[in-house]
Amino acid sequence: MQAQQLPYEFFSEENAPKWRGLLVPALKKVQGQVHPTLESNDDALQYVEELILQLLNMLCQAQPRSASDVEERVQKSFPHPIDKWAIADAQSAIEKRKRRNPLSLPAERIHHLLREVLGYKIDHQVSVYIVAVLEYISADILKLVGNYVRNIRHYEITKQDIKVAMCADKVLMDMFHQDVEDINILSLTDEEPSTSGEQTYYDLVKAFMAEIRQYIRELNLIIKVFREPFVSNSKLFSSNDVENIFSRIVDIHELSVKLLGHIEDTVEMTDEGSPHPLVGSCFEDLAEELAFDPYESYARDILRPGFHGHFLSQLSKPGAALYLQSIGEGFKEAVQYVLPRLLLAPVYHCLHYFELLKQLEEKSEDQEDKECMKQAITALLNVQSGMEKICSKSLAKRRLSESACRFYSQQMKGKQLAIKKMNEIQKNIDGWEGKDIGQCCNEFIMEGTLTRVGAKHERHIFLFDGLMICCKSNHGQPRLPGASSAEYRLKEKFFMRKVQINDKDDTSEYKHAFEIILKDGNSVIFSAKSAEEKNNWMAALISLQYRSTLERMLDVTVLQEEKEEQMRLPSAEVYRFAEPDSEENILFEENVQPKAGIPIIKAGTVLKLIERLTYHMYADPNFVRTFLTTYRSFCRPQELLSLLIERFEIPEPEPTEADRIAIENGDQPLSAELKRFRKEYIQPVQLRVLNVCRHWVEHHFYDFERDADLLQRMEEFIGTVRGKAMKKWVESITKIIQRKKIARDNGPGHNITFQSSPPTVEWHISRPGHIETFDLLTLHPIEIARQLTLLESDLYRAVQPSELVGSVWTKEDKEINSPNLLKMIRHTTNLTLWFEKCIVETENLEERVAVVSRIIEILQVFQELNNFNGVLEVVSAMNSSPVYRLDHTFEQIPSRQKKILEEAHELSEDHYKKYLAKLRSINPPCVPFFGIYLTNILKTEEGNPEVLRRHGKELINFSKRRRVAEITGEIQQYQNQPYCLRVEPDIKRFFENLNPMGNSMEKEFTDYLFNKSLEIEPRHPKPLPRFPKKYSYPLKSPGVRPSNPRPGTMRHPTPLQQEPRKISYSRIPESETESTASAPNSPRTPLTPPPASGTSSNTDVCSVFDSDHSASPFHSRSASVSSISLSKGTDEVPVPPPVPPRRRPESAPAESSPSKIMSKHLDSPPAIPPRQPTSKAYSPRYSISDRTSISDPPESPPLLPPREPVRTPDVFSSSPLHLQPPPLGKKSDHGNAFFPNSPSPFTPPPPQTPSPHGTRRHLPSPPLTQEMDLHSIAGPPVPPRQSTSQLIPKLPPKTYKREHTHPSMHRDGPPLLENAHSS
């Protein structure tokens, strides 16, 4: 028995695990009920759980045996009126329990645990009663905190928010912290600093929207809490009495709600290209309707001289005080002192309108909006002059600021100012002890002088929301050096939640007095100098004491109204979009925190997606953008327009049988309900349908250009829309359509103005107009790069998101669906082939070296112009099979240009890590490499299912579309900035008409290129053939510096190797295997074969060029060793390296014919850029450690790159990010050279083609020079592959004397690193 009587410890080590987390899921559900647009983090819900368990402990201490015992405990322990509401909820729960479970908290589990807590079996009904009380208090806490969070314009409830909000709520503080002296809340300095500086137009609009929402809540408080008791008791207060006190407050409330709705609609419908929301028309329309006139008559009534006397006379009527006291504790005092101050708030708010309109007119960047503001200001001149005249007579005498009339805290307007004020006050008080003011208060209310009855001297009072500080003035200067110079000396301080305010009538001893009653029964009486001063102090003190009670009264009233006036929707049979949400038609993301409190859709039916696209409760602009970008993958444009029209045409709900009987009797039961339905459902839905239409024609007009019938239907639909609220949106859509039609008929117009003039066109040997002489060596390399950059920039900027979604560029209708993307693919492939052709058709070695050198100069200018697509085109050409094998040519390329080429190749290594870092570090304009986007889109499309199945229903996987839209959004962010360069029409035309293949088929052309390569540099180790010169003009390059640099002309962006401080690639770990911008992971496809070995470490998608990522494929004569290889530990177990495609075993032939590989024809667009097969473990072309032969040229070239765009792969490889490797013995039908890809090191090698040549051997590199030593390199930190190690031996220079004394490298040889150490 003794053990049972010991108090139960909820938070002990033994019991805490039983309760921890028990209530959190239910609390999350409760929070969703009271504030559906907010989110709560786990810490916040766990803190609420602790509070509820604390409350449960308090209820269980009374050892309840029946519901009446619990009720009695609640009445004794809970503050009024929360006890009354909690009991009412509990009783309701017991009654409903017989029919269904109305509770969110787990009543059954709590009932089971209560037997252990109490030590005896408790009746189930008592448990339900207790749980209902707990749920009510939890809802009350979350409702209070949610209001605070919305007030500070946040979207997530945190633990700190709960502490701050509860600290300002006397009711909850009394309940949970009755015996705690003071509660420490974090200082406001932890919050983000307040923004200082000049506000923009959009800042003003956002601030005003938040302010008017709070203002509307104040009006609701006046009307629903204070005015309602006067209206409901016609015996005490006549309608004339109510009119005299509250004047036209209802009209003002209606105007405020209408104004907020107009502004919200305008902000929602604002075009992305607009500088800011154009809210001028909102004020102009209402001003022309004379909607602001009630403010003038209201101010006249409230500020008339006899108003206060009449107001007090109403309260002094017989029975009035008793009636008001019966409504709630302190309600009579709140009416007497708080209501008069609240009634002044509309006056100050109206005066604020006039100031706001002037500020908005000044900040507006739109001429039409400025004109609307002027018209609104002019229309309000009469109201403004009348208001100012009334206020100048009355408000000046009252000496009240606007903040004094505010019921709700405005601390977030200037938190830093509040902190500064608190700190200044505390420093000015001598003898301060205890915690700082800022640790127990959030807001400074007021200060002034009061007389404490019985004291000799006056007290200077500082009133905060949590403290009342009474000080005595320090008279005279300090006598001793170092003594405090504070102006005040602390006498006493009162915690506002621990005191009771009592009004005192005037007596002979004191006048204008009030009493502060402490919890221990002692009291202090203060008197003011006048009745007006007393009213000011009482208004502030009563507001602090009863603010939470009044807010709860408002919330209860609003909730009750919502229950009584539930909006009735049409039946789902009549209106398909009225079907309730369920798991069979819509799913939401569970682990994603929405930023604006709007749920994020994971999947849904088309109808549900359209419903949420035009939802009546909130707007979701991100969803609108994503939907219009991706909808074509699951819905045709004609179907979308039909659904939008169906959504727009909303039928009104049919009357019930009771409604029909009432109508027959002459009543109008549906009038109020229909009015609400039209206002809260029909109007917002129709506006959002128009908003979707406007976005559609503005940003996706190509849908209408491809289908004239679609455009005609849209225009007919817009023409049928009626209603004043819709007028300006209809006009906006009509203007957009007309503008788009004109642009379509006249062609694209470019009217771009640059800050500086573009640079002059550079010429070399060829001259303007002589297009027949244009060639790689006759045109200036700077101008070739510039004109190609302009051309590729135009092609890149022309690609629309719809050409990418659903991988439509790989589908049957690609010419229709992806015309601009295919143009870019074809241009890039043609340019790459042209570079290859220029090189291999130049037979003479000296001229060929000049051609390669000129191409590298073009690459250098590409880098300076941030044309990454062009850079990778050049790299691809240099890495192609016909060019890659030209060893003798690359030997004569200057080392500086080799370094430039190697650095360019490094952009594609390690999953394009350096390219992505470079792209993020530069400023537009630029031409990004498109292939990486297409790869990411293809992986996302193919790695995620089109639909999700739930309960036998198929839901559109919108999460997948959202990921694709994020990629297209990244593409679009680089499409806005054009180049400040001058178009040279002839050069542009020359490159637009490039056709290196002529009439040849691609297989035939690639065979020709490779055979030509073999002709100019044969495989056999014999003297290089001599060829006559092809060109009669000088081969010397004009260089890559502009010939006429002028001040103010465009300077090329700094090339990669010249800006090590912007981005140092040496600081990027080469060992990382994941790209920083890899595509979203997707599920493994069921047909994907597992890796051949668990030792594979490079299965990610890699370079588009299929060349060695760890060593340069170029012909560097420096002793460069792969930085990847060198990073391996020396104690690693030697593992045979994967077989490089360029190496052949002794028994295998050395060459493969390209004619056996290429099988695609020119009728399908070629892909860009071509690529080489690559692997992380490929050895460098001239590696120190594995090149043992000094006689043989390099091995046979890599596999030829395909020229086709990607076909949708059937399945992916073991990782969802990889394309499936080709089957054994069959060449992969790449068709997707435009996509970065890397074969697995364990992919079976391609079939070998017999060759008459012998075994290939490796050529050694020249010796490592002192300048190239790792510790002596003084240049920028890129590229890392130029690093060397002291462990690498120095080898003799390469010679071309053919010797067959060295063994060739076999597939089972040791890795590079081990070779290096062993040699």
Swiss-Prot record:
Expressed in most embryonic and adult tissues. The modification Phosphoserine is found at residues 1078, 1082, 1120, 1147, 1164, 1196, 1215, 1261. Residues 1296-1309 have a biased composition (Basic and acidic residues). Residues 200-390 form the DH domain. Residues 597-741 form the N-terminal Ras-GEF domain. Keywords: Guanine-nucleotide releasing factor, Phosphoprotein. The keyword Heme does not apply. Residues 444-548 form the PH domain. Residues 1019-1101, 1121-1319 are annotated as: Disordered. InterPro entries: DBL_dom_sf (IPR035899), DH_dom (IPR000219), Histone-fold (IPR009072), PH-like_dom_sf (IPR011993), PH_domain (IPR001849), Ras-like_GEF (IPR008937), Ras-like_Gua-exchang_fac_N (IPR000651), Ras_G-nucl-exch_fac_CS (IPR019804). GO terms for biological process: B cell homeostasis; B cell receptor signaling pathway; blood vessel morphogenesis; cardiac atrium morphogenesis; epidermal growth factor receptor signaling pathway; ERBB2-ERBB3 signaling pathway; eyelid development in camera-type eye; fibroblast growth factor receptor signaling pathway. GO terms for cellular component: cytosol; glutamatergic synapse; GTPase complex; neuronal cell body; postsynaptic density. Phosphorylation at Ser-1120 and Ser-1147 by RPS6KA3 create YWHAB and YWHAE binding sites and which contribute to the negative regulation of EGF-induced MAPK1/3 phosphorylation. Residues 780-1019 form the Ras-GEF domain. Pfam families: RasGEF, RasGEF_N, RhoGEF, SOS1_NGEF_PH. One of its GO terms (molecular function) is guanyl-nucleotide exchange factor activity. It comes from the Eukaryota. Residues 1194-1203, 1238-1250 have a biased composition (Pro residues). Interacts (via C-terminus) with GRB2 (via SH3 domain). Forms a complex with phosphorylated MUC1 and GRB2 (via its SH3 domains). Interacts with phosphorylated LAT2. Interacts with NCK1 and NCK2. Part of a complex consisting of ABI1, EPS8 and SOS1. Interacts (Ser-1120 and Ser-1147 phosphorylated form) with YWHAB and YWHAE. Promotes the exchange of Ras-bound GDP by GTP. Probably by promoting Ras activation, regulates phosphorylation of MAP kinase MAPK3 in response to EGF. Catalytic component of a trimeric complex that participates in transduction of signals from Ras to Rac by promoting the Rac-specific guanine nucleotide exchange factor (GEF) activity. PANTHER family: GUANINE NUCLEOTIDE EXCHANGE FACTOR, SON OF SEVENLESS HOMOLOG 1. This is Son of sevenless homolog 1. The lineage of its organism: Eukaryota, Metazoa, Chordata, Craniata, Vertebrata.
